[in-house]
Amino acid sequence: MVIANDEYSIWRTAPDASRLCYQHFCWRELYKSNIHPSIDLTNRPNLRIAELATGHCLWAIQVAEEYPHAQVEASDISLGLMPPKPDLPANLAVRKWSFFDPVPEEWIGAFDLLHVRLVIQPFGGNQDPRSVLDKFVSMLKPGGYLQWDEYDYHNADKNNVYSANDPVLVPNPEVTHNSSTKVWKLIMKTFQWPTEHFDRLADYFSAAGLTDVAAHKKRPPPAVFRAFYEHWYALVAQLLPVLDSMDAGAGQEAKELLMQMKKDAVVDGVYSAHITKFVVGRKPEQ
């Protein structure tokens, strides 16, 4: 199933704005930085940084503040979650753009760093992301970096990780309290999110001509492990009406699993999170 642009209105609500802000600070805590430590932006004149599918624009705002000498650009198919323009840093420009559309001419070969995060949903219907990846690569300067942040979607039963308040009482939560894993698989299947394609992003980076490619995987640290769980719970709850409209049976199953997830946490002290993955590659110097 391919989700049309007008259907994204569900993601432009106040609850989603709050969830996305929460998500941003959880991810920032992973490396205490917005930009992966392997990326070196020193000694780059006319530094330009872009974030695509920016949502609430927090990543771009913070990067613009961290790099006041850089020109930062943020884009999305809707600007509805962004702060008012007068509140944005002077070195941050925003515009409406979908990465399924042709790349603006002025963006070809323009950026030292291009960032995108958690964009599997628009590729519903098991769409191949490689044509979009080629656009991203075309937007990089020679020597420019692409940072693409996702969860480690493939084999969700192996990449869901758990934490229990009482490991003696609950020694194998991935077996006894796996409602989170089940709802994860159900959502991936119903929306036909292309998990296998996204699992191969590092290979696709290399095939697209990027070098120094690495997929940096990291378990959420204790400081934000429960926060990642709470964010996942909020996302599932927000997806329920859409899921129910697509498949009533899947919607009902998801509701029951969501109730079990809450019981797992509140009663048994078991929380689940997903392995995060930062895929980084660099365009060769000419």
PLM region spans:
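Class I SAM-dependent methyltransferase Rossmann-like catalytic core
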Residues: 1-46
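A short acidic, Gly/Pro-enriched loop at the edge of an enzyme's catalytic core
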Residues: 103-114
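C-terminal helical/coil "lid" or tail adjacent to the Rossmann-like core of SAM-dependent
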Residues: 7-9, 174-178, 182, 214-274
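Core SAM-dependent methyltransferase catalytic element
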Residues: 208-211, 274-286
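A short glycine-rich, Lys/Arg-flanked "PGG" loop and its adjoining helix->strand segment in the class I
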Residues: 130-142
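Class I SAM-dependent methyltransferase SAM/SAH-binding core
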Residues: 46-105, 131
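Residues lining the SAM
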Residues: 113-120, 149
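Conserved catalytic/acceptor-binding region of the Class I
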Residues: 141, 145-233
